[in-house]
Every structure is written in C-alpha cells, then in structure tokens.
Amino acid sequence: MKYDGIVIYSDLDGTLLDAERNLSKENLDAINWFISQGGRFGVATGRMERTTDIMFPDLHLNVPSIFFNGAMAYDTSSGKVLFKTVISGDLKPVLKKFISEYPETCCEINIHGKAYVFNPNDILQTQLDREGILVEEARWEDIPGEWIKVLFMGDHGTLEKIKADFDKLGRTDLNIVFSEDDILDIMEKSASKGAALYKLKSMFGENWRLVVSIGDNDNDAELVQNADLGIAVGNATPAVKRVSDFIIKDHNTPCIPQVLELLESYL
C-alpha cells in the first residue's frame, strides 16, 4: 500500500491541535486516510497516556505513542506499557522547598494513571479541562513511588527561577524542559521524546522505512532531529526550526495534509 512502512509521530499541543486546543476535521481525515493506505500514526506528547482516549476518542493511533515527554511509550490499543522511565532519588525535600518559596506556582506529580498536586492554580484547572486527568491533593507520605514526571505550572518568569534553582543544585540526573510557556517539566535525565523515538525505532525499525516527526516546542527538538524527516510547524521555537528538514504553516493550519503533501517526494 502507498504508505506501508511510513510512521508519523506528531506532538499535540501547538502542533496537531490548533490555538483553541481543537483537533480539526481536516487533520482527522488526513490521519484516517494515511492509516487506510498502510501508514502508522502516533502522538508524542507531554500529556498523560489517558488523554487521547478521553479527549480525542476519534483519533486513531495504530502505533505505540510517546507520553510524559518521552518517559513512557504506551500502546493505546492494547493498554500495554512498552517502557517507562521513572525519576530516581528522593525529590520530596526539593519540591517541598520550592512549593513553599513559590506558593503561587502549582506542583504536579505524575504517576501512571494519576496525578498529585500542591498549590493548585488556574493553570492547573486549564490543564484538567483540556486533558481529562485525575488529580488528588494528598499528603507527601501518601504519594506512592515511581514518579514519571513532575510539573510546575505558573508564570514563565517564576518557572525560569525554579529551573535556575534546580541548576544551582547540580541535579544532572534530571531533564528539565519547558513543554509550554507556563509549564515546566521535570523527568529522569534519559527521558525525552527524542530518546523514546530512538528506542521505538530500535524495537520496530526493521518494519519502518521512514519515520516522520512534527513538533513546535523545545521539548520536540530532539524528536524532530531523530526522525528521518523532521518537520517544524510555523509557530515552532527557533530550536525546533533549526533542526527541522521542513517548516510548514503554523498550528492553526492543519498540519497532516501538509505533511502528506511533503511525503509525495519520498514515496
């Protein structure tokens, strides 16, 4: 079939979704056409693994997808976790210090299927509305282990201070990156969308002749770079545009039809 062996991984927010966080009919139709012709489509997002089933039930994913900014690869069809990377070491003392110093900033701890929050704010509420995740305010001692990702949500300037505070602590074991202007993600150092794509290519590569990835934010740069064909949307950060092979229109213009047009010269 036309797209046999071709895999597309797309970021969600700022890429596949428009400025209102909507998934357009044009993108859905293009994805369904791509899959019907033998293609494989997955997402690579900072969101939890539940988000696509809850918020985008019509989105067909037929390849294991990348969640938590690369800390987990999850097959939404089978419910199988292919791999996950959890934060090692005890972050609780550091997080307690930061949520005390920055009380206006929300801290969220992601564990498989659930999240625990401190200092809930409006940005958290926006996240809950758009992602459909389950959160709980809990005591530190009641939070289980195997943390996949920690988020801070707040004013960008405050988040820059928190990032700088982590840098001062010399926490080289962590990967700290902005997934959005008002969200700072913290994961194990080895966890990234690009690293997850590399692992998936090593697992399925013999059946994948061309891997395409699309993104917009700094956390997508390695994903775009590690693809055979890396694409930045027009609203992408300079870091993503620098490593991309092509730059298409911004996320308010459906990206998948543009990608399929670009693919014509690779078939």
Model region roles, listed by residue range:
Residues 59-61, 69, 77, 169-172, ...:
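Short, structured coil segments at secondary-structure junctions
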Residues 27, 52-56, 162, 166, ...:
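Hydrophobic packing residues within well-ordered alpha-helices of enzyme cores
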Residues 38-42, 62-63, 148-149, 209-210, ...:
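Short active-site oxyanion
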Residues 33, 97-98, 165-168, 239:
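Alpha-helical scaffold elements within enzyme catalytic domains, especially in hydrolases
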Residues 20-124:
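Active-site phosphate-binding/coordination module
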Residues 104-214, 218, 222-223, 235:
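Conserved acidic, metal-coordinating active-site core of Asp-based
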Residues 12, 47, 215-217:
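Active-site metal-binding loops of divalent metal-dependent hydrolases
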Residues 2-7, 24, 185-267:
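Mg2+-dependent phosphoryl-transfer enzymes with acidic/Ser/Thr/Gly-rich catalytic loops
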